């Protein structure tokens, strides 16, 4: 396990395994390192895989004062703790954290951004209110399912698959972190001008069956970052690392190691 102390004194940890160049994975909202284990197990022959637990999860600490900027700083602090350059893979909210952290660290080797969440319509915050009411009434499973279905747009089939996975209990424990991330994202202002300075190779993954909102955000980021490209994950949605881990891992290896399977 790797751990660092972020700027506000919060301890942030990563679980790691494998051999090869370092690959740092930044998970999205409602998940932790367990969520990525399916895909990570298929990457460890090629990379030393580090899966970050963002603040408020597993062995990572938390802080009573939350801000989205602290999330960015956490990822940057992890990156800066490596002696070598690092491949980075960020998903959804973690994709945004990865994007912002790449402006704060100088050792990013290459980026994969899987449907980075760069916006949340403030008109939809009423959905966040509903989720919070479920959490306040001690219904974490109902709250998590509501988030997945009504806010993210994950299919009923994918939700039922998620419920039978061994990490479901951990996801329920972290459900209280979801509303703060949604509200922070709703007030976040995406600055295209800032990201035009990114020069490391950048690939955006998008599910062929993902909601249009994610496809739109991918297109916006791709138009911003010079020489970036988009790879469509055919037949997949927002969570291909769970629904098709073999295919997903193969695409990561092809992207980062340039077809050296």
Stretches found by the model and what they are:
Residues 41, 50-89, 93, 250:
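Active-site loop/oxyanion-hole signature of alpha/beta-hydrolase fold enzymes
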Residues 84-121:
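Conserved hydrolase catalytic core segment
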Residues 233-246:
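Catalytic histidine-centered segment of alpha/beta-hydrolase-like enzymes
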Residues 6-61:
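Conserved HGGG/HGGXW glycine-rich cap/lid loop of the alpha/beta-hydrolase fold
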Residues 25-28, 92, 207:
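Glycine-rich His-Gly loop
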Residues 123-124, 139-179, 186:
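Conserved alpha/beta-hydrolase catalytic His-Asp/Glu region
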Residues 170-223, 229-232:
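Conserved serine/cysteine hydrolase catalytic core
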């Amino acid at each position: 396990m790797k751990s660092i102390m972020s700027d506000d004194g919060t301890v942030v940890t990563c679980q790691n395994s494998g051999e090869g160049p370092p690959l740092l994975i930044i998970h999205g909202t409602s998940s932790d390192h367990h969520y990525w284990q399916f895909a990570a197990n298929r990457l460890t022959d090629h990379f030393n895989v580090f899966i970050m637990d963002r603040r408020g999860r597993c062995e990572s600490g938390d802080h009573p004062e939350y801000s989205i900027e602290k999330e960015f700083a956490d990822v940057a602090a992890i990156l800066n703790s490596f002696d070598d350059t690092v491949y980075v893979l960020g998903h959804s909210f973690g994709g945004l954290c990865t994007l912002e952290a790449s402006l704060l660290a100088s050792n990013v080797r290459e980026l994969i951004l899987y449907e980075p969440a760069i916006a949340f319509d403030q008109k939809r915050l009423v959905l966040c209110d509903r989720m919070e009411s479920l959490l306040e009434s001690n219904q974490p499973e109902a709250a998590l399912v509501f988030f997945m279905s009504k806010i993210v747009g994950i299919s009923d089939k994918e939700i039922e698959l998620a419920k039978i996975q061994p990490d479901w209990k951990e996801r329920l424990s972290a459900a209280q972190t979801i509303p703060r991330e949604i509200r922070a994202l709703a007030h976040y202002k995406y600055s295209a001008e800032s990201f035009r300075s990114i020069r490391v190779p950048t690939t955006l993954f998008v599910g062929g069956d993902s909601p249009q909102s994610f496809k739109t955000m991918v297109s916006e980021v791709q138009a911003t970052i010079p020489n970036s490209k988009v790879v469509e994950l055919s037949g997949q949605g927002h969570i291909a690392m769970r629904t098709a881990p073999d295919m997903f891992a193969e695409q990561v290896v092809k992207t980062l190691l340039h077809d050296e399977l």
